[in-house]
Amino acid sequence: MWIQQLLGLSSMPIRWPGRSLGSHLWILIAMLQLAVDFPSCDSLGPGPEFRLLSRPQRPQRLWSLRTGPPTRLPTPAWSPRAARAERAHGPIQMQTPRARRAHRPRDQVATLGPKGGLTKPPAATRSSPSLTSASASSSMTAGAAEHQSLLKRGRRHTHDAEFNDFDFHGGRPTTETEFIAWGPTGDEEALESNTFPGGFGPTTVSILQTRKTTMAATTTTTAASTATAMTLQTKGVTESLDPWKRTPVGVSTTEPSTSPSNNGKDIQPPRILGETSGLAVHQIITITVSLIMVIAALITTLVLKNCCAPSGHTRRNSHQRKMNQQEESCQNLTDFTPARVPSSVDIFTAYNETLQCSHECVRASVPVYADETLHSTGEYKSTFNGNRSSSADRHLIPVAFVSEKWFEISC
């Protein structure tokens, strides 16, 4: 369209002295315009992501014969989101209400008008044959340089928009478009400029308000979560333009934020998920096992002491009884007197019923002594029965004890 217009202007009669010079100048301008527009067409051509939202306006000339200085070219207004939505759902008019709500902030931003040197130039005036060819060539060179810089800037914005529009949820394309609001983790970074210079002013304000609301909710939930000793860092979580989607930013940070907190309160450093305050699990298990072992040792000691005390007392009593018997036997043996020992016949006849031993055993075990001074049988029996009334009878031998010992040894 504009090439035909340029060719039509070049075919118009020019009232310059030197018609051939003016014709060659118009041809040179048309060729330069084609050379400048080809890179922009190549950048927009291969990718179907970038399509023009509206009908392209009439291109502005590189220079004007009436105003003199070159005018700025308008940058093409493309939107990657519109292309994705059209490819996934068909025409733009067939989008769901959910997608239309997601596009609403972007559309509002677009209506505010871009900043940073991307504003539309004023309407160019018609050219008038009042300048010379020298001024035209200088203005054409300056306009070409500025147009190249604008094309580079637009191409950089295009790559940034393509990178920011990439879906990070699994690396697969989603049928529903999503706008990622990259937000800072601190208050001092809330007013930083976004990737598109001057294009997201209202978005920055909404992100800041969302962060204030999120931090206020975090302050109320932190008091309730102290009982479980598990805190989560929600300061770095920024909500997207959709209220049901959130993009966590800075959740994995383990260092406390050095930025001043709200109301002058210090924010506790974030903790790792699953970490509990106090003793670890293996420490609790070790302490429990140690206590159980100590209690078992005490119970075992008490049981053994109670069980062994009666048996030890009984053993001690029996040992004491044996010692007493040995002492008595030794004392009785010291009073041994051979003159008063009865004969073997008397011993056998006196103790035959109690010892139940044969005549040979008694004769072999008990030595035969002289039967000179023997007492009567009744007196001997009284001596055997142990009825020693006075100390005078201590010179008698305890015949029962001696005969019993010899009986045990021999029989």
UniProtKB/Swiss-Prot annotation:
Cytoplasmic-side segments: 305-411
GO biological process: cell adhesion; negative regulation of cell-matrix adhesion; negative regulation of wound healing; regulation of polarized epithelial cell differentiation
Disulphide bonds in the chain: none
Compositional bias annotation for Low complexity: 62-76, 121-145, 247-264
Side Extracellular, residues: 44-283
Topology term for the membrane: Single-pass type I membrane protein
GO MF entry, a single one: protein-containing complex binding
Region spans: Disordered: 62-156, 242-270
Region (Targeting signals): 304-411
GO cellular component entries: adherens junction; apical plasma membrane; basolateral plasma membrane; cell surface; cell-cell contact zone; cytoplasmic side of plasma membrane; plasma membrane
Transmembrane segments: 284-304
Pfam families found in the cross-reference section: AJAP1_PANP_C
Stretch forming the signal peptide: 1-43
Keywords annotated in UniProt: Cell adhesion, Cell junction, Cell membrane, Membrane, Signal, Transmembrane, Transmembrane helix
Locations listed in the record: Basolateral cell membrane; Apical cell membrane; Cell junction, Adherens junction
Superkingdom in the source lineage: Eukaryota
Chain's role: Plays a role in cell adhesion and cell migration.
Alphabetized PANTHER family for the sequence: ADHERENS JUNCTION-ASSOCIATED PROTEIN 1
Assembly information from the UniProt record: Forms a complex with CDH1 and CTNNB1; interacts directly with CTNNB1. Interacts with AP1M2 and with isoform 2 of BSG/CD147.
Record-given protein name: Adherens junction-associated protein 1
Organism: Rattus norvegicus
Lineage: Eukaryota, Metazoa, Chordata, Craniata, Vertebrata
